[in-house]
Structure formats: C-alpha cells, structure tokens
Regions:
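Catalytic Zn2+-binding segment of zinc metalloproteases
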Residues: 376-392, 410
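Acidic/His/Gly-enriched intrinsically disordered linker/tail segments
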Residues: 397, 401-442
Length: 442
C-alpha cells in the first residue's frame, strides 16, 4: 500500500581470499538508509559465520534427534568437541569518522548502538574489519566453504555469508534478528555492492554483479571467447578450456589478482574461486533482453557438466521468465560443488559429478540437472521476490519447486521429474501421520 517501505543497505568491500591459510580477510563500509517512519536507536547486523564459532549451538540444533540415553564420551564427541576454529573475528567496528562504535554480540547477531538516533529518510555509514577461517564444508558442513582435491592439492571455494550483513527491519516485526544456526536461511535487505576480491593470480572467479575489469583478469583470447559467447545462443562457448584448467591447476601462483564487481539492487553477494575451473557461457534471449548463462566446473565434473549445466541454466531463465517476469540481471551462474545445492543472487552451487569410475547414471544426470534448475530458479524466489526465508521457508521453496517442474518438462521430453503433478503428493499425504513434517517455517 501507500505506506509500504523497504530499507536499503549498500556495501563497499575489499576482500582477500588467502588460499594458503584458508582464510578470508575483509573490510567493508555499510551505508544504511532508513526509509521507515521510525527513528532507529540501534542497528542489527548478521554474523552468520558465528554458527561455526566454538560456543555455537549449531551442533545441538543440527542433530536430527537425540536418543533417550547417550554415553558421556559420545555426548562430548558429538556436542562439545568442535575442532574447527570458526566464526568472525572483528578487528574494529567504527563510525564514518573512524571512531569505535558500541556493540554487543549475541551469537550470530550483533547490535550496534548508534550515538544518535537514525531518523526517517536519513542514512548512516560505518565500517567493519574482520577475518575468519574458511571451513571445509564437506567435513564441517555449511552452505559455503571449500572443497579439497587431495590428488592435486587444490581447493574449490564457494564463498557466501562471508561478511557482516544488515538484518531486515520491516513494518511487520521491526528487526528480524532470529539467530542463524545453519538450517534456516536468510532475511536480507536490497542494496548496491562494490566489491574488490583479491585471489591467487591463477584463480578463475565469478560472483554476483558485473565484472568491471574483465581484460585485467582474463587473457586476451579468453576475452574474445566471452565476446563470442555473448552472440552465441545455441550452445555454450568455452571461455577457459579443459586443457587450460588442467595446466593452471598445477601452478600455485604466489602472485595475486583483484577482481572488481558492482551489483545493483541485490539482496546479497557471493563468489566462487578456484584454479581448477573450466568456464563456459552462452547467451539467452528473453523477451526484453539477453542474459548470459554461465557454468564453472573442474575437469572432474566432465563430461556431464559441459553437456548439460549451461543449457539447464538457459532453460531455467526461459521457463521462469515465461511464467513470471523477465530475469532482471545480466547473468546467471552455475558452479559445480559436490554436496552443495545453494543459491545466491546471480550465482549458485550445485552437486552432481560422474562417480569414481567416471560413470554417469540416470540418477546422477537428472539429479544434477534438477538441482541446477532449482537453484538458478531461486533467483526469482527469493532473490527478486524477497521473502523472509529465515521465518517462512515454504514461500520461496513452494513456488520454485512448481516452476522447476515446468522447466524440467521444457528441458527434455519425458523428463523424470520427482515433483510437480498434484497426484504425486498423494503417497505423502496418505502416509503415516507420525512422519508428516510440518510446513517449512521457523
């Protein structure tokens, strides 16, 4: 209605990915716009990495169930011994003049007390410097982290929730400051991002937003290939080839490059980086614009990914745009990351690779295609239609799952979709009531 408002949070960030020490260092300036009719005496900031801090309650909450009796040594091992040294380490929280701000940290949330109330239609800027150790998500779990390739000593990074982020303030509940323990997802405010990411010079990287310095981070030949991809609508064009990726993964450069991105009107920012990446792309024609469909994957993902990933991204954009609204951003990226299925604005992590013998079963093939369609589809819900995932997971999951079915059927005739038609809910609803889970919410 006429009284509707939404807050805005803008970020300027410089981030360093330290591959040798598996660590992120960052400094950010947040400019928070108060578009509400209320004066705000304090701000809530999300510290999602603290779900991995030693005092985190995540191990207790992540456990599916606890038996009636547990041996003492088993309880200590599962619920009290956390070997990974995770969580944000805050170096400073300063105002625009460089003076320290008063703040209190409560697990995964931080309240910053403002020197003077932030009045309606005003904005405030403050800076945070931080670092944290990156988790091996295949060992420690989580929606971001790194995947270790022991045979060649490389890592594939999928980095999200890596910076302190503004919590949502709205006209329904005020501050949405529910804790993040890993299971719930995210409630976020839209804003603009200017992000500089320093990584090893031999890494290939993609992220939310427009890459501002393509000619500085890709070779001249790779830039030409990308320009060709922008005009190619029928099949992906290899920007970084399998042979180039194989050669690069042996290098381990001690030099660095800075990748510069700008993203406008997005609710979050994420990136992926590795020297193992093959990179392909193709153009997708929508009703009002062309969009780039992009995939990043290691050689271990082939031949499956080069054959299907980018085409699945393209089909998702076509089907979802047909049934909802044209995709507003300029690209959508699918990244191969084993044991992942997670979405962020313009970029997502997806599982599915040939088995250890190089065999691709129908289960692996269709599972990979489906998760790509689903996670790319989350760009529409909740990345654009910005629902509160922390409180109401079903809102975006329900819409996305329905549209996923439509995209699967468009992608391939007789696609074996696991969900979609209404009759497929019958076995679930007619099953043992003791095992029916409640609607997805917190």
């Amino acid at each position: 209605g006429p009284a509707y408002y939404q807050q805005q949070a803008d970020y300027k960030m410089d981030v360093v990915l330290d591959d040798k020490n598996k660590r992120i260092d960052g400094v950010e300036t947040i400019t928070y716009h108060n578009n509400s009719p209320e004066s705000l005496e304090y701000l809530w900031v999300q510290l999602d990495q603290n779900m991995r801090a030693r005092q985190s309650k995540t191990p207790l909450i992540e456990s599916q169930k606890m038996e009636g009796s547990v041996p003492v040594d088993g309880f200590v091992k599962n619920y009290m011994q956390q070997t990974f040294d995770g969580g944000f380490n805050l170096v400073y929280v300063n105002d625009a003049n460089g003076k320290p701000l008063s703040y209190v940290i409560n697990q995964t949330m931080m309240r910053i007390d403002l020197p003077t109330p932030l009045k309606p239609k005003e904005k405030v800027s403050f800076s945070i410097k931080w670092w944290y150790n990156i988790n091996n998500y295949r060992v420690d779990g989580g929606r971001s982290g790194y995947e270790e390739f022991e045979k060649d000593g490389n890592r594939l990074y999928v980095i999200a929730q890596f910076f302190p982020r503004m919590a949502v303030y709205n006209d329904v509940e005020g501050w949405q400051n529910m804790q993040f323990w890993g299971r719930g997802e995210f409630a976020l405010a839209f804003g603009n991002y200017d992000v500089n990411i320093t990584v090893p010079a031999d890494h290939v990287l993609e992220a939310t937003g427009v890459l501002l310095n393509r000619k500085e981070v890709f070779t001249a030949e790779q830039v030409k290939r990308y320009e060709l991809a922008e005009k190619t609508f029928d099949k992906p064009v290899l920007i970084v080839t399998p042979d180039e990726a194989k050669a690069t993964e042996k290098g381990f450069s001690d030099k660095t490059k800075i990748w510069k991105f700008r993203a406008e009107n997005v609710r979050d920012f994420a990136f992926s980086s590795s020297r193992k990446f093959i990179y392909d792309a193709m153009a997708v024609k929508l009703e009002t614009k062309n969009v780039m469909a992009i995939s990043l994957y290691p050689n271990e993902s082939n031949p499956l990914w080069e054959q299907y990933s980018t085409k699945a991204v393209a089909q998702t954009l076509k089907t979802y745009s047909k049934h909802t609204f044209d995709y507003p951003y300029h690209k959508a990226i699918s990244v191969s990351a084993e044991d992942q299925g997670m979405e962020y604005p313009m970029i997502c992590w997806n599982y599915g690779r040939p088995d250890a013998n190089g065999y691709v079963s129908d289960r692996i093939k269709y599972g990979m295609i489906s998760v790509i369609i689903h996670e790319v589809g989350h760009n529409y819900f909740p990345m654009i239609v910005n629902s509160d995932e922390r409180q109401w997971s079903w809102m975006d999951e329900g819409l996305d799952t329905f549209l996923q079915y439509l995209a699967e059927q468009d992608f391939m005739e007789n696609y074996p979709s696991s969900r979609g038609p209404a009759h497929k809910i019958v076995p679930y609803m007619s099953g043992d009531q003791k095992f029916l889970e409640p609607i997805m919410s917190n």
